[in-house]
């Protein structure tokens, strides 16, 4: 598979559809993933933690199975067992825990529909269906350029796919994924379970370095890698005392 970048257009739970976030999901060539979902206009109560949700994981945390829906159309079943989930980290009440079964179907427009069901009150209780509509984005453009199946727009050139993971055995866990010119990452302090232990970044990458910051949150931003000019798969970086390993490049 090739690395992809998606922007969420619509989020629907039950009969209510809305979109309050600037959500981007990055998926590396090898299937590592992160979804960063900051609010565009957080309320006063939300400003302390201005994100709807963040989750991430390595490719061993998702199972992908081609299948068909009830109409016989091809869909992709993706079963996520999140390696990291802000709702679980923060111990948010009525949070789904465990695998989330999702189904992905391509629309003629080029958009991708994701449907599924979560069980925030327990697997033995009634589930809540949801739908998310995703727009593929050109990861090689620093502008938000859509990939439209209607006009046949193609990505210009190969797509960079670099993934760095915090080395086990430290006080933090974290993942950073670069797809094309877009970088997203998270850090979580294992010794905390509050918003004070979380840090997130979304950046453009230019000339092998993080350039313009699109979103930043948290007190540990200095621990994120910023220079990728000499990274090779398997190499180790130490950033402000934190060790990262390049697990894909």
UniProtKB/Swiss-Prot annotation:
Pfam families xref list: HRI1 (PF16815)
GO BP, one annotated term: protein targeting to membrane
Keywords: Cytoplasm, Nucleus
Spans through the membrane: none
Recorded superkingdom: Eukaryota
Cell compartment(s), UniProt: Cytoplasm; Nucleus
InterPro entries cross-referenced by the UniProt entry: Hri1, Hri1_N, Hri1_N_sf
Entry's Gene Ontology cellular component terms: endoplasmic reticulum membrane; fungal biofilm matrix; nucleus
Similarity remark: Belongs to the HRI1 family.
Protein name: Protein HRI1
């Amino acid at each position: 598979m090739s690395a992809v970048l998606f922007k969420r257009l619509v989020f629907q739970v039950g009969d209510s559809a809305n979109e309050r976030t600037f959500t981007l999901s990055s998926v590396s060539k090898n299937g590592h993933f992160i979804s960063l979902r900051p609010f565009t206009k957080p309320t006063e109560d939300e400003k302390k933690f201005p994100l709807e949700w963040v989750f991430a994981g390595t490719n061993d945390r998702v199972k992908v199975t081609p299948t068909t829906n009830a109409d016989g159309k091809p869909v992709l079943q993706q079963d996520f067992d999140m390696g990291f989930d802000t709702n679980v980290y923060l111990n948010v009440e009525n949070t789904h825990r465990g695998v989330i079964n999702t189904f992905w179907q391509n629309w003629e427009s080029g958009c991708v529909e994701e449907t599924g069901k979560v069980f925030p009150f327990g697997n033995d209780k009634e589930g809540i269906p949801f739908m998310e509509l995703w727009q593929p984005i050109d990861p090689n453009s620093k502008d938000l350029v859509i990939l439209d199946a209607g006009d046949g727009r193609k990505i210009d050139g190969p797509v960079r796919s670099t993934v760095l993971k915090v080395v086990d055995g430290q006080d933090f866990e974290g993942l950073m994924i670069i797809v094309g010119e877009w970088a997203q990452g998270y850090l979580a302090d294992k010794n905390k379970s509050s918003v004070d232990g979380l840090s997130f970044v979304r950046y453009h990458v230019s000339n092998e370095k993080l350039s313009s910051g699109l979103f930043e949150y948290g007190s540990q931003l200095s621990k994120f890698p910023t220079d990728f000019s000499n990274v090779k798969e398997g190499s180790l970086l130490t950033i402000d005392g934190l060790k990262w390993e390049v697990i894909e490049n």
